[in-house]
């Protein structure tokens, strides 16, 4: 992905104040934001042409909830399944984490959340362009890129992935 192209974060959150707060945090950190007030709209956006690099998802939504969103997302084509970070006020987050991981969530934060922890998670997981436009851009970048030896990443100690 072109390093000058901003990553697009889909924020699926029904509470307008929380959605605006997340938008402000993400935009000030240099991300593009696509808001969705419910799971149905979020799923429509994932099925559209605009690339989505990550989803921030509330669990308690009108109509289909966050769990249903994750299940529907899992049934989509692989290029329509961006990473998901759950951000929810549920008291049962510790109990739900295994189910959320099983459904594809990379991370789960409880509201109120630590802004730096959220941004660290977004930076870590928002790495993949999805959608028709993203797939086309990735394909053209691969064709245009000269062949090179694959680089090996060095990691420190244990994984920092939070679930």
Residue ranges and their predicted role:
Residues 20-28:
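Charged docking surfaces used in two-component/phosphorelay signaling
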Residues 35-54:
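Acidic, metal-coordinating helix/loop segments flanking the phosphotransfer/catalytic sites
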Residues 67-80:
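Short amphipathic alpha-helix used as the core "switch/output" element in two-component signaling
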Residues 87-88:
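Hydrophobic/aromatic residues positioned on beta-strands within the core alpha/beta folds
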